UniProtKB/Swiss-Prot annotation:
Keywords: Ribonucleoprotein, Ribosomal protein, RNA-binding, rRNA-binding. InterPro entries: Ribosomal_uS4, Ribosomal_uS4_bac-type, Ribosomal_uS4_CS, Ribosomal_uS4_N, S4_RNA-bd, S4_RNA-bd_sf. This is Small ribosomal subunit protein uS4. One of its GO terms (cellular component) is small ribosomal subunit. SUPFAM superfamilies: Alpha-L RNA-binding motif (SSF55174). It comes from Polynucleobacter asymbioticus (strain DSM 18221 / CIP 109841 / QLW-P1DMWA-1) (Polynucleobacter necessarius subsp. asymbioticus). Gene3D superfamilies: Ribosomal Protein S4 Delta 41, Chain A, domain 1 (1.10.1050.10), RNA-binding S4 domain (3.10.290.10).
């Protein structure tokens, strides 16, 4: 599956907010002007962005945060629409329940991209079994662990140390000594961080 391999700061500037694509040890510097669009002098437009433009921009932002491509994102939205409850909130819950995101939230990867790589390289166990599919939906009670042969990777220890300095999410529990964690529950909307206006995405797909 194709992935964006270009500068992460460029994407953050395009969306005007930190997309958390870079780890805390290499966070966006002060030189990255989030209020200036990419381009030699920052692209400007004399006209106000349309409602459609804002909706499209929000969808692009969420896709980039979670590292999901268009076709897969549409499938997530269709599934969210099929389920009972608030479609936008359910969409975010589906994205947050992806295995690569759970690995990231547990602190085993410093970014979602790094967490995805750990899964793809079979460094992760789900309920005791090795898995290599980042998009697997994790369920409440599932146990996610680092495989024995991967426990010596310095990047995992460094990532856990960084997470210890930040506010941990409440819907996962982590045993840093065992390098394993439990997905306690699907997060509520207020538990999901990030400047996301999911209602704009719902409006976009409702056109």
């Amino acid at each position: 599956m194709a992935r964006y391999l270009g500068p992460k700061a460029k994407l953050a500037r395009r969306e005007g907010t930190d997309l958390f694509l870079k780890s805390a040890r290499r966070a966006l510097s002060d030189k990255c002007k989030l209020d200036t669009k990419p381009g030699q002098h920052g692209r400007t437009s004399g006209s106000r962005t349309s409602d459609y433009g804002n909706q499209l921009r929000e969808k692009q932002k969420v896709k980039r945060i979670y590292g999901v491509l268009e076709r897969q994102f549409r499938r997530y939205f269709a599934e969210a629409e099929r389920r009972k409850g608030n479609t936008g909130e359910t969409l975010l819950q589906l994205l947050e329940s992806r295995l690569d995101n759970v690995v990231y939230r547990m602190g085993f990867g410093s970014t979602r991209a790094e967490a995805r790589q750990l899964v793809s390289h079979c460094a992760i166990l789900l309920n005791g079994s090795p898995v290599n599919i980042p998009s697997i939906q994790v369920k409440p009670g599932d146990v996610v662990a680092i495989r024995e042969k991967a426990k010596k990777q310095a990047r995992i220890t460094e990532s856990l140390n960084l997470v210890g300095q930040m506010a941990a999410v409440t819907w996962v529990s982590v045993d840093a000594a065992k390098l394993e964690g439990t997905f306690k529950q699907v997060p509520d909307r207020e538990d999901i961080s990030g400047e996301i206006n999911e209602s704009l995405i719902v409006e976009l797909y409702s056109r």
